[in-house]
UniProtKB/Swiss-Prot annotation:
Organism annotation: Enterobacteria phage T3
Stretches assigned to the Periplasmic side: 56-67
Function of the protein: Accumulates harmlessly in the cytoplasmic membrane until it reaches a critical concentration that triggers the formation of micron-scale pores (holes) causing host cell membrane disruption and endolysin escape into the periplasmic space. Participates in determining the precise timing of host cell lysis. Participates with the endolysin and spanin proteins in the sequential events which lead to the programmed host cell lysis releasing the mature viral particles from the host cell.
GO biological process, one term: viral release from host cell by cytolysis
Main location: host cell
Topology relative to the membrane: Single-pass type II membrane protein
Similarity section: Belongs to the T7likevirus holin family.
Cytoplasmic topological intervals: 1-36
A GO term from the CC aspect: membrane
Gene giving rise to this polypeptide: 17.5
Any GO molecular function: pore-forming activity
Protein name per Swiss-Prot or TrEMBL: Holin
C-alpha cells in the first residue's frame, strides 16, 4: 500500500517552489533572471561599501585636521 507523509513531502518541495516563484517574480522586474539579480545585488553592495569607507575616511580626515 502506498503511504505518503504529506507534511514531510511539503517540506521537501518548499525550496523548489520558492526558487521557481522567485525566478518568475525576478523576471518581471527589468527582465533579469535570478542569477543576474545576484550580480546586480553584489555590485550594489560593493558600491555602497566603497562609499561608506570613503565617507568614513573623510570624517576621520576632518577630525584629524580640526585638532
Amino acid at each position: 500500500m502506498l503511504s505518503l507523509d504529506f507534511n514531510n513531502e511539503l517540506i521537501k518541495a518548499a525550496p523548489i517552489v520558492g526558487t521557481g516563484v522567485a525566478d518568475v517574480s525576478a523576471r518581471r522586474f527589468f527582465g533579469l533572471s535570478l542569477n543576474e539579480w545576484f550580480y546586480v545585488a553584489r555590485i550594489a553592495y560593493t558600491v555602497v561599501x566603497i562609499g561608506a569607507k570613503v565617507v568614513d575616511k573623510i570624517i576621520d580626515w576632518k577630525k584629524a585636521t580640526k585638532e
